[in-house]
Swiss-Prot record:
It is a multi-pass membrane protein. This is NADH-quinone oxidoreductase subunit K. GO terms for molecular function: NADH:ubiquinone reductase (non-electrogenic) activity; quinone binding. Signal peptide: none annotated. GO terms for biological process: ATP synthesis coupled electron transport.
């Protein structure tokens, strides 16, 4: 019943994770950094689902639900921070956040 071999699914998850990591390191726009984090979290969730389906265990799907709920919380908090940074500095550049003073 397994349509996707374990190696192929983990390879796709690894490629997605690496793409998210490259986007995280290269981009300076905080919106793109948040999108890269989402890609990385979805890659980890895909790895959980693929590994769980390999051994016919529902644990992968349970972890997927956990990762999706964490991603939703991360996105809402990240977008709130993004809006505050834009209101204060009128830019979405990450380097502007290093100029914040307490």
């Amino acid at each position: 019943m397994n349509a996707i071999p374990l190696e192929h699914g983990l390879a796709v998850a690894g490629v997605l994770f690496c793409l998210g990591l490259v986007g995280l390191m290269v981009r300076r726009n905080i919106l793109f950094v948040l999108m890269s984090l989402e890609i990385m979290m979805n890659a980890a969730a895909l790895a959980f689902v693929v590994a769980g389906s390999r051994w016919a265990q529902p644990d992968g799907q349970v972890m997927f639900i956990l990762v999706i709920s964490l991603a939703a919380a991360e996105a809402s908090i990240g977008l709130a921070i993004l809006m505050q940074l834009y209101r204060r500095f009128h830019t979405l550049d990450i380097d502007a956040a290093s100029e914040m003073r307490g």
